[in-house]
Amino acid sequence: MTSNFSQATLQLCYENVNASCIKTPYSPGLRVLLYMVFGFGAVLAVCGNLLVVISVLHFKQLHSPANFLIASLASADFLVGISVMPFSMVRSIESCWYFGDTFCSLHSCCDVAFCYSSALHLCFISVDRYIAVTDPLVYPTKFTVSVSGICISISWILPLVYSSAVFYTGISAMGIENLVSALNCVGGCQVVVNQDWVLISFLLFFIPTLVMIILYSKIFLVAKQQAVKIETSVSGSKGESSLESHKARVAKRERKAAKTLGVTVLAFIVSWLPYTIDTLIDAFMGFITPAYVYEFCCWSAYYNSAMNPLIYAFFYPWFRKAMKLILSGKILKGHSSTTSLFSE
């Protein structure tokens, strides 16, 4: 009875194609809900990160090496939102890939490249914040625009090379050809790689994450020591010198920036950890993860691209002010690029 029921309700991605994948659709109500949730994430990733990029590039007050890194990170998240999430949304909800094999490879390549680019950007931002907090007065001479440019280049080139190697050379499927052949069907876009490449993928997540955790642990330790030192010097001497006052203001500003970006790093780790663990389990235990669990892990990672602008809006008054100027159209006025965005 069960087999007859399954056969009667069996749906295919392409009804008239022999090698079509099996379609496992959700109920109409759940599909509408999922389209709303996933679509909202894509729109937020596109619009929010576009606002970040425009803010940094337009307002001269934001032209700094650290902010250029943030703008480049926002560019990667923007590309995830516009070129990855909409198509993944259809695949996740319809359980079929309707965009062809060629675009499947390109989409998968972009998916991996842009997401790992975000990880490397955050790693370099952690290095930037570490230098800024531990040595704020010397920081401008250490982390220059050229250094920022090198970090940005590495953050884009390495993920693009890695993802191209995975999806366009075929070496990632060596040793699992039978599995790839068994999973191959019309209307599918499965990413299957061997254990060696899964380990490389894990290291691409683990190493930057470990660097971030170590650096931010040191950052908050140093920040705490600085806060105690400043409080002691202020309470011990009412006639604080202008140099000490300047040091205190600079240190306070850098600590605040480090705190905000620390929240960004934490959001990245929480978002990406489920997907990373899931890929390891699948690679070494025979792809035992249910489809809905895998999709949840994927979208947890995707949604990270939409989180960063919300974090900036919550913690950065200058971003809220820049956002208002952009949305109101005031940036189209002359000399708007010289508008002061900081209260101090």
Curated annotation (Swiss-Prot):
Domain of life of the native organism: Eukaryota
Main location class: membrane
Stretches assigned to the Cytoplasmic side: 58-67, 128-146, 218-260, 320-344
Keyword ATP-binding appears in the UniProt entry: no
Alphabetic keyword roster: Cell membrane, Disulfide bond, G-protein coupled receptor, Glycoprotein, Membrane, Receptor, Transducer, Transmembrane, Transmembrane helix
UniProt-listed InterPro entries: GPCR_Rhodpsn, GPCR_Rhodpsn_7TM, TAAR, TAAR_fam
UniProt record similarity statement: Belongs to the G-protein coupled receptor 1 family.
Functional description taken from the UniProt entry: Olfactory receptor activated by trace amines, such as N-methylpiperidine and N,N-dimethylcyclohexylamine. Trace amine compounds are enriched in animal body fluids and act on trace amine-associated receptors (TAARs) to elicit both intraspecific and interspecific innate behaviors. Ligand-binding causes a conformation change that triggers signaling via G(s)-class of G alpha proteins (GNAL or GNAS).
Protein name: Trace amine-associated receptor 8c
Taxonomic source organism: Rattus norvegicus (Rat)
